[in-house]
Amino acid sequence: MPNHGRLTQKGSGGASEADRSQVLLDLRGVEKAYRTPAGDFLALKGIDLQVQRGAFVAITGKSGAGKSTLINMVTGIDRPTAGEVHVGNVAVHHLREDQVAVWRGGNVGVIFQFFQLLPMLTCAQNVMLPMDFASLYKSTRERRERALYLLEQVDIAEQANKLPSAVSGGQRQRVAIARALANDPMFLAADEPTGNLDSKTADAIFAVFAKLVSQGKTILMVTHDRDLASRTDRCLRIVDGQLVPARINKPLAQEIV
């Protein structure tokens, strides 16, 4: 596996030889029910999923099929009604609310369709914010240095001192990716990250993801874009809350230029 330090400036540590150690995301019999006036609605129906470290996995499906609910399970944003969610050696489904917030802040990078940048902060300050919340890096200077480093990695460093409103949608999404990487997360969860972008800009964002995967990051991406999904390592489809068997795509290395 490539050295994560090329991206994060932090050591990746040694890896066990056991195959099991290569599984980063492990969902076992995950169900999620929501109460409605008409009764319980089962959004996820017994999801079993394993994602290897360093994989780029796409989740596709129609609106309402359960894609975002699945993302919420692996990120700890929501809890399963039944089943188990393991990330690395952490049983996320067993964490208390205060524990899961701390765990997510240090281990998960979430990327949204509509960027979710704070408009009153500069691009660099938006990237620094997760470090501040997680009390990582000792000084404002260190946090800014890391923010600039990450913005450079996603080719947006020249916009560091601008407000989000002063840059394009594609540039804002690059800032959002840098922010998601701020605390060197174990994996990135991207929920429709190109859904608000034109096709050319979406391709550019996908190239950023491909670069991150080449440097050892694990990415789980929800998308309606079948072309982008077909270019990941592995493509899954959710139909009525159930996963359709995986398809192995062409090597992601072909995307990296």
Name these PLM-found stretches.
Residues 1-33, 245-257:
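ABC-family P-loop ATPase nucleotide-binding domain
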Residues 23-238:
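ABC family nucleotide-binding domain
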Residues 235-248:
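H-loop (His-switch) and adjacent beta-strand-loop-beta switch element
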